[in-house]
């Protein structure tokens, strides 16, 4: 049996832009994607700490070092620049893999610069 397990998150990032007219997705600074081991086009959940909204979308790469967390498309109705969010990724793992999984937690500062990688 496979289990769906939490495997990585970017914790308490700040939304820097919201573009209602973009087709969809979330644009994330490539440095943060690398730190969290999230791939371009990978499904992610976004949990808005500021207002409680939650959604599923997919990740796009933003410029390295930019700190960009850009909410695109219809999701821009749910999240605004300045909102604090958690961006999480999950994966399917065998029973054995699930029991030894060590998720990555990427902690960022107010400008979405990497502060620390922290295991759960």
From Swiss-Prot:
Is synthesized initially as an inactive proenzyme, which is activated by self-cleavage at a specific serine bond to produce a beta-subunit with a hydroxyl group at its C-terminus and an alpha-subunit with a pyruvoyl group at its N-terminus. Pathway: Cofactor biosynthesis; (R)-pantothenate biosynthesis; beta-alanine from L-aspartate: step 1/1. The modification Pyruvic acid (Ser) is found at residue 25. One of its GO terms (molecular function) is aspartate 1-decarboxylase activity. It comes from the Bacteria. Binds 1 pyruvoyl group covalently per subunit. Its main location: cytoplasm. Keywords: Autocatalytic cleavage, Cytoplasm, Decarboxylase, Lyase, Pantothenate biosynthesis, Pyruvate, Schiff base, Zymogen. Transmembrane segments: none annotated. Coiled coil: none annotated. Substrate binds at residues 57, 73-75. Its cofactor is pyruvate. GO terms for cellular component: cytosol. It is found in: Cytoplasm. GO terms for biological process: alanine biosynthetic process; pantothenate biosynthetic process. Its EC number is 4.1.1.11. Heterooctamer of four alpha and four beta subunits. Catalyzes the pyruvoyl-dependent decarboxylation of aspartate to produce beta-alanine. This is Aspartate 1-decarboxylase. It comes from Deinococcus radiodurans (strain ATCC 13939 / DSM 20539 / JCM 16871 / CCUG 27074 / LMG 4051 / NBRC 15346 / NCIMB 9279 / VKM B-1422 / R1). The lineage of its organism: Bacteria, Thermotogati, Deinococcota, Deinococci, Deinococcales.
